[in-house]
């Protein structure tokens, strides 16, 4: 939720690959392969944000 609070105040959320790895304990496949990270983590997360919150990702 802290990340969403940052977004709410600025309208922009900036993160790093390393932060995502640490925060969400991503599997090694997503840590080493950005295409895999996007396909199996980021795209589904953005879809859920757009569908279930008033935020637009």
Swiss-Prot record:
Keywords recorded for this protein, A-Z: Plasmid
Any Pfam family the entry gives: Rep3_C
InterPro entries: WH-like_DNA-bd_sf (IPR036388), WH_DNA-bd_sf (IPR036390)
SUPFAM superfamilies per record: Winged helix' DNA-binding domain
Protein name: Uncharacterized 6.6 kDa protein
Annotated organism of origin: Escherichia coli
